Swiss-Prot record:
GO biological process, one term: meiotic cell cycle
Function: Has a role in meiosis.
Cellular component GO terms, alphabetical: cell division site; cytosol; mitotic spindle pole body; nucleus
Organism phylogeny: Eukaryota, Fungi, Dikarya, Ascomycota, Taphrinomycotina
Protein name: Meiotically up-regulated gene 93 protein
UniProt TPR repeat ranges: 75-108
Main location: cytoplasm
PANTHER family: RNA POLYMERASE II-ASSOCIATED PROTEIN 3
Sorted UniProt keywords: Cytoplasm, Meiosis, Nucleus, TPR repeat
Amino acid sequence: MEEKENVNLVEKSNYVALENTREIDVFDEFLNAIGNENTITPVYADSSLTHLRKKSYTKVVHDCTYALVINPYDKKVIWRRGLAYLRLGHPHLANRDWEHSLELDPNNTYIQKSLHRLKEVYYIYRECAETWQLRHLRVASSQQLPVGLRKQYPNIIRGKIWWKKVHDNCQLCGQQCELKKENLSAMRSMLYMANTYAKDDTENHSPSAQIGIESSEDELENKITKGEHSLLVPEELYRSNYPCPQNIDQFLYMIKVLSAPCLYIETFSFPISTINQLFKAHGMSVEQLNLFLKSIHYIGLCSRFCKQWSDKARSLMQALSGLPWFSFVVQHCLHITAAQILLHIPDIQEEEFRNWHVSKKPINNTDLSSEFEIAEIPINCYT
């Protein structure tokens, strides 16, 4: 028995040593390639183009980064990496690469148009966010909640609500909270921490984190979705000045940001006709949609609520959870991660999640973003 155990230990040690030598050989190969850029650079450039056509954008960034280490002045590779960054939801990185590519090729009109379009769309997004930050429009009587709920929440229905900068007071009741020392940014901090953990998990499993070790994109996505902290939230959602939607356009925009944060730069909003068809297909009327808009207005992002208003928001959600269409909207329109944000009230109970048909853990669910693709940009700008 002891001899067999010794043999197994020797085999394991030999296997580990072999794997280590393979990694060392791959790294040495890459270092040697730096001195022989004429033969190796086209290999990375061709593979990046292949991955770009297959929409494997993480591998495109991986190959383009290697190619740029060898030759940092390759215009094709710089353009492709910027395009991959844009598809992955990093417009600022795409802007950086495209500006670098434009410096190398200032007469390229296509890059100029793409940069102008990118900055224009991003500016429109920021302008709308700032506009919604300042005010909420007056709600017509036909779009208000039933009389019983209006009596329960009188201060929210009446008039206009002007959003101010973050302060120590509750932004809904407009008065100083009884517990003035209460940390109103606790929930935003939790969302920020979840974002940090999710990004760290993504970086640890990224192909560029380990030289020479390839991992398929499907395996990478499975590792991320199965992780405990896999909630990637746009930065606008855990900042205190993000407004609640008050009309159909703002509602559609919020759905877009929450359901597909990596796409909201390119596809700015859903077509209203599509969302109307979706509601009609499930027997939902415009009045029900308006009721849901008002429920979002009350709930908002619960990170801005003091404890008093969090309790009232919870009771409102319990009242709305009895409606047959509410669980469908939560599950299919806002998607599971958005529902977690909207229902993330302090000291939430598991029973309440079950009543709302929402799970605490992220699950693979169908969202509206799968029906809408990014506006295509030709990938053969330099080919």
